[in-house]
Each structure stands twice: as structure tokens, then as C-alpha cells.
């Protein structure tokens, strides 16, 4: 049947930096997971991906957000999303390998299925430029090595350029990755 097998939650920008009123972040994440689950249930199939995007702040030393604070921001969202019933964590549109690492560590620590006690699968995608570099300079092999070292379940590229410009980067991802490329 046509359609999507993975539904993403509408939580790309949801974090304590943007939603700091009492209970606001929790309500947003829970509603997003519930809405995605409803769509999957209506379709009769589908997994729910808790969608995590960049915090909107640069991490130190390039910016003012400490690494530990970034981990904490992501852990809060992942904890709420996992408790609400997300099936996996999708970290996407990352341009800083340090922030990407913070998000993955948070997902590993807080992304526990409350029913099974198992870690939720983690997918991670980044934004490369046409030279295969992140905003902060990391290249394809370095990002793959980091993500595979952190034991993500799948990795890939999204946004930033069109399909023709992405093709050489995707080919490099496929050449070096030992986990599924998304």
C-alpha cells in the first residue's frame, strides 16, 4: 500500500528554550505524539518518530550553550516523547556534530520504551554542503564514525541542497556507513 510507514511528530523545534511556561513543553510533545499515533492508527500501520531538530543555539565554544545543557534540553523532550508512546527518535537537520552528539546521547539515556524497558531506535540526519561538510566543518566519514561509535540505528542527510547536489554525498554515505542510510 502507498503511504508512509513512519510518522514524524510535530516537535522539530520543541525544547525548553522555546517553550518554558509550566507544562507547555510536556503538553506540546504529548499532543504531537498522540496526533501522530492517531494518524498511524487511522492508516492501520505506522511507527511514530519523535522528531528532534537543532536547539536554535550554537554550542560552546562557537556559541553560548554548554554541551551539558544541550544534552539536558534534548533529554527532557525525549523522556516526554518516550513516555507518550514514540516508537523511535529521529534527530534531524543537524549542522553541528557537537550538538548532534548531545542529541544522540540524550536519546540513548532518555529514549526508553516504558512498556519494554528497551532503548528506542535512533535515526540521525545532518545537513551537508555541496563539499560534504557540516557548518562546523565535519565531513561525511567523520560524522559516520561518530554516529556509528554512538551506535545509532540509521543515519542520513536531509535539507540543505537539492537532489542533484545531494547525490555525491549520499554515495559517500552509502560507501562508508555500516548502518542503514535514510
Task: Briefly describe each language-model feature range.
Residues 1-182:
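Domain-level signal for soluble alpha/beta catalytic cores
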